């Protein structure tokens, strides 16, 4: 499926959230992604998709999205690193590629910038097997804890 992309992850422990971003002229291209545990994709700031569909431990589904007039692709990946009712305990990763007419325009490990999402606090208490961790967002020194 992937010709050039390399699966990446920052091993910072449990409950890690990373952002991958690529800029360029991606008009008419196809975006492919496989990730664990969950991802959200944005094209030029507009929500494009969420995934992946569930798969057995050790397997990952590759999703494809068509990009129209697009110049920026941003992927937000949540890696919980624990078992729950919707995930298995496995290594988190993100592997993505943007291809147009057989030419690879961007691939993880080469063209995507990666950073940790510091808007979410990482070290929080797990709640239960149903809900992973509670989310604690950091916004201008005000702590918002959704229930």
What annotation goes with each model-predicted range?
Residues 1-48, 61-146:
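Beta-strand-rich recognition domains
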Residues 49-57:
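A short acidic/small-residue loop/turn micro-motif
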